[in-house]
């Protein structure tokens, strides 16, 4: 059996919170639902319940009919396969996170962030990886990344802080593309110049993703050479948000950043 998706885990956690709010132990709830204890445990850990089973849980946990809609929507979304699956790409679960997020805050140390990349920059990144990939694999990655960028047009709140170290490999087209994206009302781009000195950003790139599920939450996402990790621990997320705010203060303001990028583009 495959691992549960992020959406399925979110649904399981939401159902667990409802059960606890109703004052029921897992065993008590399982008995009243005519489930065995292990089945309810698996559901709360991300196994997708049947629709009628989920409705029975909402009823048992005292959720009013007028309050059911967000949970039904969560179930419907957890039942879907993401549009990216046919491309057969390795995304470490990030695309499903980004797809559902209402706000993304990204700090990038060495690359232009994916949502701001041109197709030629994307290809250069993938071709530069240690593991050589086929042309088809690269083109699938590019196609998915281009489609991901549609989120910017659909209103995703996006704040990118890009370290100066990420710019030497960016050509004129890429630089102008960043400034074009930054003109959107929902997009904010800041450059963290080398003049800012040593700072927390040297610890590496990271993203913070905010969601509008019942029980608003934030996820910290970090990629590393062996894969990626997403962190939901409240204290770790809080610490990472403070780091992001600090980097934002050190970085050039959005209008100053656009001027800085524009000057760099004029030199290329």
Could you describe each region identified by the protein language model?
Residues 69-103:
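Short, charged recognition helix plus adjacent turn
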Residues 8-11, 25-30, 83-85, 94, ...:
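Short hydrophobic/aromatic-rich motifs at helix boundaries and adjacent loops
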Residues 103, 107-268:
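Hydrophobic protein-protein interaction segments
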Residues 44, 98, 223:
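Acidic-residue sensor for enzyme active/binding pockets
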Residues 54, 92-97, 263-264:
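Short alpha-helical linear motifs
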Residues 1-81:
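Basic, Lys/Arg-rich alpha-helical nucleic-acid-recognition elements, primarily the DNA-binding modules
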Residues 50-51, 62, 87-90, 209, ...:
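Short, structured secondary-structure boundary patches
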Residues 31-33, 91, 259-260:
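Short secondary-structure junction/hinge motifs that connect adjacent elements
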């Amino acid at each position: 059996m495959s691992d549960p998706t992020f959406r399925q885990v979110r649904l399981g956690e939401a159902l667990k919170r409802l059960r606890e709010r109703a004052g029921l132990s897992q065993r008590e709830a399982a008995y009243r639902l005519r489930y065995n204890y292990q089945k309810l445990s698996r559901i709360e850990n991300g196994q997708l319940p049947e629709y009628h089973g989920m409705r029975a849980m909402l009823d048992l946990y005292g959720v009013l009919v007028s309050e059911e809609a967000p949970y039904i929507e969560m179930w419907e979304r957890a039942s879907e396969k993401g549009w990216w699956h046919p491309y057969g790409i390795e995304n470490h679960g990030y695309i499903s996170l980004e797809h559902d997020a209402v706000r993304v805050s990204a700090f990038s140390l060495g690359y232009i962030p994916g949502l701001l990349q041109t197709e030629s920059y994307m290809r250069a990144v993938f071709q530069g990886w240690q593991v050589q990939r086929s042309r088809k694999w690269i083109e699938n990655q590019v196609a998915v990344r281009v489609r991901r960028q549609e989120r910017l047009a659909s209103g995703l709140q996006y704040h990118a802080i890009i370290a100066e170290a990420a710019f030497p490999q960016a050509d004129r087209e890429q630089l102008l593309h960043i400034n074009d994206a930054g003109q959107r009302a929902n997009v904010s781009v800041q450059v963290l110049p080398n003049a800012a000195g040593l700072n927390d950003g040297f610890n590496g790139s990271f993203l913070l993703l905010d969601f509008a599920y019942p029980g608003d939450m934030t996820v910290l996402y970090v990629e590393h050479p062996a894969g990626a990790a997403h962190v939901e621990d409240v204290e770790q997320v809080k610490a990472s948000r403070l780091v992001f705010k600090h980097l934002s203060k050190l970085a050039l303001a959005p209008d100053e950043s656009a001027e800085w990028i524009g000057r760099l583009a004029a030199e290329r």
